[in-house]
Design a protein with these regions (language model features):
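Positively charged, small/polar-rich N-terminal and surface patches that mediate targeting and assembly
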Residues: 1-107
Length: 107
């Protein structure tokens, strides 16, 4: 059974390195950082100009047990109540080149 998960961690800009350090300390072997903009229900405006919230998305493919550990630590160290305002979730990974040698491909 494939237990790999695509772990997404969304934080305010400038906090991705801290998240990668947390993830590595708990078993992640790598991550991709994606620059993004946030959208909120009540956008901030200055002089009539809407200000976008700069975000970073840290994406890492890890085993489920590692994902759960990372999520807990991010919640503690960089969660919604912190300046990083971190949010985490994971999705199942059906197949990747990381696991293709372990499972035969069926037509």
């Amino acid at each position: 059974m494939n237990e790999l998960k695509a772990l997404y961690i969304i934080v305010n800009a400038g906090f991705a390195s801290e998240i990668v350090d947390i993830a590595r300390s708990l078993g992640s072997t790598g991550a991709t950082i994606i620059n993004a903009r946030g959208s909120v229900a009540k956008p901030k405006t200055i002089l009539g100009i809407t200000i976008d919230t700069e975000k970073e998305i840290v994406l890492s493919v890890v085993k489920k047990e590692v994902a759960l550990k990372i999520m807990q630590k991010v919640k503690e160290k960089a969660g919604v109540g912190t300046p990083a305002h971190g949010l985490c979730f994971f999705l199942p990974v059906e197949m990747s080149t990381l696991t293709i040698h372990e499972q035969p491909i069926e037509d």
